[in-house]
Amino acid sequence: PNYKLTYFNLRGRAEISRYLFAYAGIKY
């Protein structure tokens, strides 16, 4: 479960970062 939770957190964090980069790219 710990490994799964870590993987989920990493994936979620990467998705958020990608969204932020995409938003920044569109804004600038």
UniProtKB/Swiss-Prot annotation:
Gene3D superfamilies: Glutaredoxin. This is Glutathione S-transferase 5. Residues 1-28 form the GST N-terminal domain. GO terms for cellular component: cytoplasm. Glutathione binds at Y7. It is found in: Cytoplasm. Its EC number is 2.5.1.18.
